[in-house]
Amino acid sequence: MEGGVAEADVSAFRECLSLSWKNPFVLRLALSAGIGGFLFGYDTGVISGALLYIRDDFKEVDTKTWLQEAIVSMALAGAIIGAAVGGWINDRFGRKKSIVVADTLFFIGSIVMASAMNPATLIVGRVFVGLGVGMASMASPLYISEASPTRVRGALVSLNGLLITGGQFLSYLINLAFTTVPGTWRWMLGVAAVPALTQVILMALLPESPRWLFRKGREEEAKEILRKIYPPEHVEDEINALKESVEMEVREAAGSDKVSIMKLLKTKTVRRGLYAGMGLQIFQQFVGINTVMYYSPTIVQLAGFASNRVALLLSLITAGLNAFGSILSIYFIDKTGRRKLVLLSLCGVVVSLVVLTVVFHETTTHSPMVSTIETSHFNNTCPGYTRATNPSQWDCMTCLKASPECGFCASRANKLLPGACLISNERTEEECNKEEREWYSRGCPSKYGWLALIGLALYIIFFSPGMGTVPWVVNSEIYPLRYRGICGGIASTSNWVSNLIVAQSFLSLTQAIGTSSTFMIFIFITVAAIIFVIIFVPETKGLPIEQVENMLQTRSLNFKFWQTSPQSAQVPDQKHQSV
């Protein structure tokens, strides 16, 4: 009924496609609002490629790891604020106006970034974009949910998620398209202004959410919109259902004025639900997904691929697999169950992280040696190499670690043969490239680089259908109805904060302890996540909220995660009940 988000399955998506001729108004509404999800994905994905060229234009960014992390992570800081403020704006001014405000922030941020003359201005633009991301992450799915027919609501809300991953994939394509255009990263970051402006125009032609209008006492406007959304024979039933649902919400809100965090934690079902919901959101980030999404081209370069363009091209694999995994999750999440799917996902993530750890260990311990003859061929030797007491023992990694000012020019005959350790600047890079040599300033030439690509691909293949989707689904099912808003907000905030911590620390960790050791940390965290899921996360597939509450109240360990839970088995026919 009205107010709940029905689960999306394959049949719902087939019916969703039929809207293109049955009710194009609903599809136009969902796609127009879904541009917010697309912008969310684009602006979080585009920085991974743009960062490669920002480093080339701003020397201080190239030499200061914390500045690179700040450019990436300040959008996340903005998103935390945007999500917090967005909830109030959604309720006070409506879903439609919230989306337009988010678009305005996207537009301003894109223009500021595209015209930035220094890193500080670039960071300001990233904060603006982050504010838009935070608001869009709440407003777009909420608008789609409240203005969609019940039977296809789950599919249309899932469409927003697909547009997020689609936006990330397109950002990699656009990054690749602008690699040979003067201004490179300015175009990459500025392009987001176009869909933002497009959405403002489209939203001006669409109505407000009927649920919000009902809550504000504007019932006639809401009824008029519902007549456009539903077939004539269903309109009156939906109007009555919406009215009852809103009245119930108002009553529950009136009884929830004095809810505090301490009161929540004293309630066993809520406390255990928060353990599961928050834990899944935190582990989703701490197993390293956004190091792959934000720094994928950089990771590819660390694996031994020198060219920015090649790094972007190879990173398309991860973005494409992420989008594909989101589609797969629609099928597997109901066939497999939440708990089993997330455990299988995490086990696969462990395997892929082991591959990455081994590959980067081999890459760093078997890098090409530095040749005195090759180095003396150029006139700008790295000062550290000149002062070294044992230059004959230097290899490529020693050269790169000696100073951010040093780089490695590979041998022309074979990049795995001894090369030159030189001062890293544009002139040196040009001289190196003129002699048909490859220039390395991030990673070193390696015969194992292609294995790193396999590791990244495996990571996304295992992560996306399970850990990419399940935390959000479980958080929509596990809390008592009265506390769902506040608990969902707490869990969502924990996700953004964890995301910020990982994004702000990844490059610093790789510099301090090495890339292989950094991925090893993610292995330990993922193993901890597996143990956490076994102990704290129940199976919520197909359970009504009353059954979920009872299960949390009497929770006991079930190590046989591959078996269907007793509660789930008891209610197979209740799968589509509102939770």
Regions flagged by a language model, labelled:
Residues M1-Y230, E247-V579:
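Alpha-helical transmembrane bundle of multi-pass membrane proteins
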